[in-house]
Amino acid sequence: MPHNGFDIAAPALAIAYHSGFGHTAVLADAVAAGAREAGGVVSVIAVDRMTDADWDILDGADCIVFGSATYMGNVSAGFQAFAEKTGQRCHNGTWRDKVAAGFTNSGAKSGDKVQTLVSLAVFAAQHHMHWVNLGLGAGWNSSRGSENDLNRLGFWLGAGAQTDVDADPDQVHPSDVRTCRHLGWRVALVTRQLNVGRAVTPAASSPAASSAPTR
């Protein structure tokens, strides 16, 4: 019998981000808004101000979406400091099999920010999490396109945004805000799908490593 998932609890998502000047914080709120539209219960957490309660939220979430400004072609020092505090959780498998995704913002159109998304994905992989890509085609790549297209900068691993270095946080490009909102919606939907699968298939409800072959 098909399972519609309505009897499954709403997925719990946490948006864990670092923002140096407020632009990435705007994108974090957009991801959260999209996740709520898809029925998620969302917490937004600035990782440079972590409390014990924040760590508990991350540990209990079904999904964590990571976000960082791109500085010098990689995640910010603030995000990296947070990542390095998760070492024991990585060792213990605390976040194993949670869903993950990522987003970033830079001052330049490219800014080498794909490296930031790669770093976020590798961080998630080290925690044995399931990475969700952006799920959008490229925008602004034809004569009929414009900078107002979703995914205007053409990223697939996660959401990539660009904000002028002298712009205020309320001047983050509307297309980038909508792209991050899409990411939140998509990752919440995937998380719900995974939760439904775990509910109806006992084999899917246990950590993947528990049934892994030994050599």
Spans of model-derived segments:
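N-terminal beta1-alpha1-beta2 submodule of the flavodoxin-like/Rossmannoid cofactor-binding fold
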Residues: M1-W95, D166-R215
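Gly/Ser/Thr-rich helix-start
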Residues: F21-H23, S68, N74, D112, ...
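Glycine-centered flexibility motif
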Residues: G34, A77, D112, V132, ...
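Generic structural "secondary-structure junction" signal
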Residues: G73-A77, D97, N105, L134, ...
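Short, glycine-/small-residue-rich phosphate/pyrophosphate-handling segment
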Residues: V99-N151
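Short, local alpha-helical segments
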Residues: F103-N105, T163-P169
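Short glycine/proline-rich, acidic loop/turn segments that cap or connect secondary-structure elements
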Residues: S146-T163
